[in-house]
């Protein structure tokens, strides 16, 4: 608890958001909810003092879970796959796309002082599906607008924006949608970036730190089989299993990266790993 207020993590997964919340506030989350037993096991290992619910988020009664305690922060990271462009043109699941509505349930029943929601940037396009379970382009964003309006009607000030993880020291350029809603009358304050490209003026002047490269998270002492080797060759050379051939889209993505970061890059990052 923070000053007597609970912290609740819906869609808690293995505990990534919970760990971030603890790093930011100094307090462990009080309640974590996830339907996956394996995810809950991992969450328990990392957050043993948290009350865990291995259930569908809709099955948990906010009033009973909170036992009369006020909520300082309720965090929501609903399933993103049925919004993400990474899913391509595959049919979407209306029920999964609608999981975010559980935030309104919590807002209406126990009124968290601050609500935060994280998802892919396409979350803003949330709208109705046609009979073939594909988004209706002419109605993109309609459901999202209703979602925001209902939070507003409940007395919340709502702001949202897209943030790039690298701007805050994470070794990834991943962009994510973030929403903050609060009902305590205090201003919503977004964090200022702490990092920028190494050749930016902000970094040159010492105002910001340079981006952290993904290579800092890689162990280059591990075997790195060629993308051109077969599964059998990799097993013989390294004694490990590997899927080959790679999917064509994966190969295309590797080719684009090679062209962008090696062939067309005046300062290519090259490392010998074998």
Model-derived features: positions:
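Class I SAM-dependent methyltransferase "Motif I" SAM/SAH-binding loop
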Residues: 11-15
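A short, Lys/Arg-enriched amphipathic alpha-helix followed by its capping loop at the start of a domain
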Residues: 20-28, 46
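The conserved SAM/SAH-binding core of class I Rossmann-like methyltransferase domains
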Residues: 33
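Conserved SAM/SAH-binding beta-strand->alpha-helix loop
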Residues: 36
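Class I S-adenosyl-L-methionine
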Residues: 63-73, 80-274
């Amino acid at each position: 608890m923070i000053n007597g207020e609970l912290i609740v993590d819906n869609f808690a997964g293995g505990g990534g958001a919970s760990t971030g919340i603890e790093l930011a506030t100094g307090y462990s989350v009080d309640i974590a909810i996830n339907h996956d037993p394996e995810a809950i096991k991992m969450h328990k290992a990392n957050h043993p003092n948290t009350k865990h619910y291995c259930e569908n988020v809709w099955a948990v009664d906010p009033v009973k879970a909170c036992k009369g305690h006020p909520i300082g922060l309720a965090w929501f990271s609903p399933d993103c796959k049925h919004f993400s462009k990474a899913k391509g043109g595959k049919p979407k699941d209306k029920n999964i796309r609608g999981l975010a509505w559980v935030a309104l349930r919590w807002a209406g029943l126990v009124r968290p002082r601050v609500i935060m929601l994280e998802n892919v940037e396409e979350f803003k396009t949330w709208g109705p599906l046609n009979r073939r379970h594909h988004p209706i382009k002419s109605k993109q964003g309609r459901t999202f607008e209703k979602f925001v309006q209902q939070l507003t009607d409940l007395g919340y000030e709502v702001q949202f924006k897209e943030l790039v993880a690298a701007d805050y020291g994470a070794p990834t350029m991943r962009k994510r949608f973030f929403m903050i809603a609060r009902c305590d009358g205090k201003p919503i304050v977004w964090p200022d970036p702490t990092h920028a490209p190494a050749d930016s003026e902000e970094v040159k002047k010492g105002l910001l730190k340079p981006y952290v490269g993904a290579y800092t998270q890689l162990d280059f002492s591990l075997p790195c089989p060629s993308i051109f080797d077969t599964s059998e060759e990799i097993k013989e050379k390294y004694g490990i299993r590997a899927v080959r051939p790679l999917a064509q889209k994966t190969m295309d993505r590797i080719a684009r990266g090679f062209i962008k970061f090696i062939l067309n890059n005046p300062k290519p990052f090259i490392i010998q790993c074998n």
